[in-house]
């Protein structure tokens, strides 16, 4: 009888142990999942927004993404903030690599975008095919919006110089709404301003807007956005797997659908 009782207890213990092993096995992917911190220019917001679910479900990792202007992100990194992955302009990443804040040899070009003019969907599209016609269109607009140069938005800094080159900076001040980050498209969509100036990808990402086109002639400027792995990354392999998705055919298709050309 004691032998039978012992056998039943042994079997019960084995069953409990097996159940625990199954439970631990099921929990293993979550236990070893990496949390990948990304510091990204707002220009990649639409692309990362669409790719995040695919990355997280495919890798089991979790993305934490901080979006801001390149200038503000650079300030934070210079002040000592770290990230697993940084998506910024190529010159800024090259500088951070020189400083030792981006891992050597990890920088990869992801996409190209250009500063564009946008209007509300369905609204007449102004002729901006030459510098002179752009000047006429800007002067005729009731209101425009672009990123505040003082906040470091790359498109805003550049467009302020364009207004100077066109000789209409003072004339445009009274009808210009300066915004932080990439909000010009939202003001256009809401009807708060007639015309917005931003990265084409930022305008295209806002429902209710349409991209008229890039700045014409020698006013045209194209920006290359690149990605690099932080030298202090806790999981470089997890960070690299996101780079691989961004540069894959799937990533390229998403970039293109968001108004950006694969690099």
Which residues are covered by each model-predicted region?
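Exported/periplasmic ABC-transporter solute-binding proteins
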Residues: 32-71, 75-79, 90-100, 108-113, ...
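Cleavable N-terminal signal peptides
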Residues: 19-21, 31
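Periplasmic-binding protein-like
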Residues: 84-87
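N-terminal export leaders
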Residues: 6-12, 16
